[in-house]
A protein has these predicted regions:
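Extreme N-terminal starter segment of soluble prokaryotic enzymes
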Residues: 2-9
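Short, high-confidence coil segments that cap the C-terminus of an alpha-helix
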Residues: 5, 35-36, 112-114
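Glycine-rich phosphate-binding P-loop
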Residues: 10-23
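N-terminal phosphate/diphosphate-binding loop that engages ATP/GTP or pyrophosphate donors
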Residues: 21-96, 100, 105-108
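Conserved catalytic-core segment of NTP-binding enzymes
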Residues: 32, 108, 115, 120-200, ...
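Short, well-ordered secondary-structure micro-motifs
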Residues: 50-51, 86-90, 127-129, 158, ...
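Beta-strand-loop-alpha "switch" segments that mediate conformational coupling across diverse proteins
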Residues: 84, 196-215
Length: 218
């Protein structure tokens, strides 16, 4: 784990593979190392109106995990009520997600914190507007990537395709997390062993169902 000012992008092999759980745990781990750490979710789809503001549950978890005081608008520049693809949710309310606006918010957070942990929405290539995907945002911010693999049937293919996409974009896959979201998966150890052999990046945590991640340095 780098101890200087830096940032990481958390992506996943699919939606609902535990990105927020892992991102929040990583933020807590960084705080325990004596660092100022803050989470960011640039685009969130799926929120409830609370005291006149749309709040996304993932964003709330990221805020709770960190130790940096920052405005909600910086941590979550774009939030939409329906839990649908971000670019569709944005279109329904006449909004176009701007990478420049996200960059500005990120820069402010990076000035405040030692580490910014940026969590994506959905998978690596999820569209955020009609021309750009989450991958374009990561390229713009030049962030090293941590891949959360939801360990279930089909995860090897999903993980290898996502890792290939990350590297094809010229980005650095600095590590991956085996998140055992299906504890009853047949041949689970063999699947994880295959991932360790083929992903060509360190497994920074192997998370059993219902347990807290134990990160290794990376």
């Amino acid at each position: 784990m780098q101890k200087n000012k830096t940032a990481y992008f958390i992506t996943g092999t699919d939606t609902d593979v535990g990105k927020t759980y892992i991102a929040s745990a990583l933020i807590k781990y960084l705080c325990e190392q004596g660092l100022q750490a803050v989470g960011m979710k640039p685009v969130a789809a799926g929120a409830e109106l609370v005291s006149g503001r749309l709040l996304n549950s993932d964003v709330i978890e990221l805020i709770k995990a960190g130790n940096v005081d920052a405005d909600l608008a910086l941590i979550n520049p774009y939030v939409f009520a329906p839990a649908i693809a971000p670019h569709i949710a944005a279109e329904k309310v006449g909004v176009t997600v701007s990478l420049d606006n996200i960059q500005q918010a990120f820069d402010v957070l990076q000035a405040k914190a030692d580490v910014v942990v940026v969590e994506g929405a959905g998978g690596f290539r999820v569209p955020i507007n009609h021309e750009q995907t989450m991958a374009d945002l990561v390229v713009k911010l030049t962030l090293p990537v941590i891949l959360v693999v939801g360990v279930r049937l089909g995860c090897i293919n999903h993980a290898l395709m996502t890792a290939g996409s990350i590297r094809a974009a010229g980005l650095n896959l600095v590590g991956w997390v085996a998140n055992r979201i299906d504890p009853n998966m047949p041949a689970i150890e063999e699947n994880i062993a295959t991932l360790k052999a083929m992903l060509k990046a360190p497994c920074i945590a192997d998370v059993a169902w219902g347990e807290e991640p134990q990160f290794i340095d990376f």
